């Protein structure tokens, strides 16, 4: 029983960490993409 609870908590912790890093990586990708778009628009306008 204890092992099962420990296993579940470990799996949950791993899932949370993976989710956190996935979100962070996604946010960085989005920010880079937006900055690229802004630079492209800027070069088009000027």
Curated annotation (Swiss-Prot):
InterPro entries: DUF7396. This is Uncharacterized 5.1 kDa protein in Gp52-ac intergenic region. It comes from Enterobacteria phage T4. It comes from the Viruses. Pfam families: DUF7396.
């Amino acid at each position: 029983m204890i092992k099962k609870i420990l296993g579940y908590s470990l799996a949950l912790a791993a899932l949370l960490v993976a989710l956190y890093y996935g979100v962070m990586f996604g946010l960085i990708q989005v920010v880079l993409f937006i900055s690229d778009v802004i630079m492209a628009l800027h070069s088009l306008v000027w």
